[in-house]
UniProtKB/Swiss-Prot annotation:
The keyword S-adenosyl-L-methionine does not apply. This is Elongation factor 1-delta. It comes from Populus euphratica (Euphrates poplar). EF-1 is composed of 4 subunits: alpha, beta (1B-alpha=beta'), delta (1B-beta), and gamma (1B-gamma). EF-1-beta and EF-1-delta stimulate the exchange of GDP bound to EF-1-alpha to GTP. One of its GO terms (molecular function) is translation elongation factor activity. Keywords: Elongation factor, Protein biosynthesis. Belongs to the EF-1-beta/EF-1-delta family. It comes from the Eukaryota.
């Protein structure tokens, strides 16, 4: 995963370049 902190919801998403560029709330916004 990226160097940025991740949320439980973000962990559920497959690791990719996108997850490294989006903010911490990625899982929630998605």
């Amino acid at each position: 995963l990226g160097s940025a902190p991740i949320t439980e919801e973000a962990i559920a998403t497959p690791p990719s370049a996108e997850t490294k560029l989006v903010p911490v709330g990625y899982g929630i916004k998605k």
